[in-house]
A protein has these predicted regions:
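Class I SAM-dependent methyltransferase Rossmann-like catalytic core
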Residues: 11-45
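Conserved SAM-binding loop of SAM-dependent methyltransferases across substrates and taxa
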Residues: 61-88
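Conserved SAM/SAH-binding beta-strand->alpha-helix loop
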Residues: 99
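Conserved SAM-binding loop
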Residues: 106-107
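Conserved SAM-binding strand-loop segment of SAM-dependent methyltransferases
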Residues: 113-124
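A conserved beta-strand element that flanks and buttresses the S-adenosyl-L-methionine
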Residues: 136
């Protein structure tokens, strides 16, 4: 499989859950996942452990989680680049997001009873992080007070 074909398949798979959230949610996910190289590079470089509980601070509508779930699905189906490390296997995907509209879009995309995904409305400056193995903060670091 050509790299561009693989990335298109991954993008299609990761964007699909957001169709239920409307045009904005879907097109936002596609735009974000296709234009921000961090999503591709965390997989290509194997930056996450093989299995992990994730916490994404300022997670928005959960685009990273959709990306990780889609990656694992393609990997398990054998549709994965031979020169890339295995896709990580999420054990739990927890997000903290300040904006309720993003939390609502995530609930539309993943459903209320998703076995791995839980996105809650809250302030990442005061939230209990729990005990995840991986903490990500994409596009939200500037919301942390440096004190």
């Amino acid at each position: 499989m050509k790299p561009n074909d693989f990335l298109k398949n991954l993008l299609d798979e990761a964007s699909a859950p957001f169709l239920s959230g409307g045009k904005f949610a879907y097109h936002y996910a596609r735009g974000k996942l296709s234009s921000d190289s961090i999503f591709r590079e965390v997989l290509k470089r194997g930056l996450f452990p093989a299995e992990a509980r994730f916490l994404d601070l300022g997670c928005g509508q959960g685009s990273l989680f959709a990306w990780l779930l889609a990656a694992r699905k393609l990997y398990e189906a054998g549709n994965w680049p031979q020169d890339w490390p295995a896709a990580p296997k999420p054990l739990a995907l927890r997000g903290i997001e300040l904006m309720q509209k993003d939390v609502d879009r995530a609930a539309q995309a993943f459903g209320a009873d998703h076995p791995l995904v839980r996105i809650e409305q809250g302030d990442m400056n005061t939230a209990d992080f729990g005990q995840p193995e991986v903490i990500t903060i994409l596009d939200a670091l500037h919301y942390f007070d440096y004190d």
